[in-house]
Amino acid sequence: MAILISGAHVVTGDAAGSVYDPGDILIEGDRIAWVGPASEAPATKPASGIEMIDARRRIALPGLVNAHMHSNESFEQGAYDNLPLELWLIHSYPPIDGQRLSEREHYLRTMVCAIESIRSGVTTVQDDLLVVGTEPEALDGAAKAYRDAGLRAVITVAMWDRPFLDCLPFLRELVPGDLAAELDRAPPPTAAEQVALFERHYRAWHGTAGRIGIIPAPSGPQRCSDDLLRGAVELSARYDLPVHTHVLETKTQAVTGQVFYGKTLVEHLDEVGMLTPRFTMNHAIWLTGRDIDLLAERGCSITHNPLSNLKLGSGVCPVRRLIDAGVNVALGTDGTATSDTADIIEAIRAGSLLHKIGTHDTSHWLGAEDVFRLATRGGARSTGLAGEIGAIEAGRKADVILLDADAWGFIPLNDPIRQLAFSITSEAVQTSIIDGRVVMRDRVIATLDEAAIKAEVAEAAERFRRERLPAMHAGARRVERYVRQVYERATAMDVPLAGEPQRRPPGFARPQRGRAQQEGRKP
């Protein structure tokens, strides 16, 4: 099947920044066959089997890439606030929790994010399915949801094999013996078991519909033995796959590297062989100058997640410094329990605004064009699809979105990328073509019965809220006081940051003391 998109304002997103207004895009099968000025379009006729899409008053963009998301959190939107990562984690992923969800529940949770992704212009998502070892029902449910929705998805098999008490510095010494024994009673699967489970998922789903990829994802170096990290590296090399890992999201994690290894977590990952061009580091906030140099030298990528970094108070990723060093940077929304959205346009807006604080030197700011690249070509490389997606160019996959130029945020049309970042909402996304297939037309998703899905999701999500969330919070409360002590102890310590000893990333201020305290007097 061929499609001709005619008369659009085409922003190709290619390296040259090509724009055609009006422009045409010819799609043949799952590939872009031609793009250029409408006046130079190949001669076509509707009778020749080509679907004609009249795209006058439409802005054509490359499909957006959400390079880091956790769809398994979608029933927890609005459940948390004012919690730093370490305390949020024990609520959303409680260490004392024997409950498992059905495959259908996993399917529905993923479908929530899939629908929101399509509606916000995402055509490719990297879903970090954060279920240890990724239980078969979890990955099967997620993969089926993406297959049915028509999205391109790179799904991770999450891995960690360290007991909960050994994933945070100082924690084991704080937790009383009876509680520690209970926490140690059900250890995670071994490194060998998790590698074997990855092989099962890879054989079952990788390459499905030409759109589904399966990749390894050690949850974080502090949660993984070196054997498991090396196992993930070996899987990545054997199958030529990306490997994604959460690293240095918080100050506590920066302290963890020093306590566990006597070096930064990035330096430790380099020692076990993980830093390669296939490696993506999620968050990357509490970096030293040496860390940045290592990431650049090894050809690594990072994902920037401004919404969750802000909500969790984690800090500000040094994106400009990373880009200037030659590190590839992609954009993500992160989980829907930390950013509370899978809407990539919200992340584009946050990323385009956040880096204008912290310095008056405008050369260090990020602009809308910078963040648009993160959400297109940057995401393509991070997901292992460089040259395949991320731009409207002949030979690339036919992932194209059409936005309504008559949306209020585009009137007048001064600069479509700046207005994408600062002016519009996802309601402006009208049509989505993924892998050469029209998945959404005039805001109606063609691949599924959205009303029926919404009704089923509402019932399942309400049951989760009523029955599951209270149990999760109860499990968290049993360890919260000890995790808070770890957090308070770690955040009071000095750690090196971007080559300088300081406590907080740019934009973080030290707590101010009153005059009496500064002078050593009682207030």
Each model region followed by its residue ranges:
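Histidine-rich, glycine-flanked metal-binding segment
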Residues: 2-3, 10-61
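Metal-coordinating catalytic core of metallo-dependent amide/deamination hydrolases
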Residues: 137-284, 290, 511, 515
